[in-house]
Amino acid sequence: IEPSNQDLYEAGLAARKKVLGEEYVNPNIEKGEKDHLTGKIQTMVTEYCWGGAWTDDTLDHKTRSMLNLAILTALGKMNELKSHTRGALRNGCTVEEITEVLAHATVYCGIPAGVDAFRSAREALDQENTEDLL
């Protein structure tokens, strides 16, 4: 039996906050509550992405984070890569693992995509004050 949309939403919201942090998620949800346009995409992201994919136990969150970094590099989605770099740290990825995922993605996605990804990840790591992790 498939879970209801409300169940997916609640599970997705919990997963989303765990990975990305409440300080990132809450303002986006609040904006969505005030604006029909952004509300629709916030609901879709929370239900289907986070409630569907991220709550499945087949892959752990650390593995999913590493996959997301590679996929976002390939797609050139650097804004999302920044938030998922911070999420990867929360999910137990080391700076060394993040570096290797981006290096591996660069081989297949090309140097320009890799340069953008490394630059964006560096910005995210700087915001997380990761000197103690290096």
Question: What residue ranges belong to the model's regions?
Answer:
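Acidic, glycine/proline-rich low-complexity segments that act as flexible tails and inter-domain linkers
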Residues: I1-K62, R90, D116-L134
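Short, charged low-complexity intrinsically disordered segments located at boundaries
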Residues: T43-V45, G76, I98-A103, D132-L134
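Substrate/cofactor-recognition hotspot
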Residues: I111-V115
